[in-house]
């Protein structure tokens, strides 16, 4: 777990995540083989907020779609990543799938991509990282995400974009607490 220690996650949270995600069926009718729908992600975000409001878990969430989903120093995604949150984002790598963005570093997004990839990417600036298995396994420059096509790590067409920002309210930082000093 990245945002929470394993002991902090109630079994119901894991059960409900598994129950509500992977809700799309393949052409052959196999459940879960076409991933998770946008409706399920919106529902999951609302469900996490309710869990936080009830005090069951110190979690909050925000569902983003369309033009709100982009990468830049001013974006809500980058804001979340810079203040202790994560972003579950739908993007492309051969096909649409979700990745977990966990940080920002030197114009790159640190992310965990569940798709196994053992060969270096053709794009030499996309790096596979095996040294941080609890935080990220890819380092991807900002420039790939904001494309409106279906190329590697692009967020795709504006109207189809989606992200869920998630925070652990115990570790979330507010902008006033994050001070950078320039010499």
PLM feature segments, named:
Residues 82, 104-183:
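Noncatalytic regulatory segments and standalone regulatory/sensor domains
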Residues 32-36, 69, 93, 167:
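Alpha-helix N-cap/loop-to-helix boundary motif
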Residues 41-46, 73-77, 151:
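Intrinsically disordered, low-complexity boundary segments flanking structured domains
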Residues 3-4, 77, 164, 180:
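Generic low-polarity alpha-helical segments
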Residues 62-121:
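Active-site-adjacent substructure of cysteine-protease-like catalytic cores
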Residues 14-15, 73-74, 159, 175:
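Short amphipathic alpha-helical segments that mediate assembly, nucleic-acid/protein binding
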Residues 46-62, 90-103, 125-137:
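Hydrophobic transmembrane alpha-helix bundles
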Residues 1-65:
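Cysteine-nucleophile protease catalytic domains, especially the papain-like/related folds used
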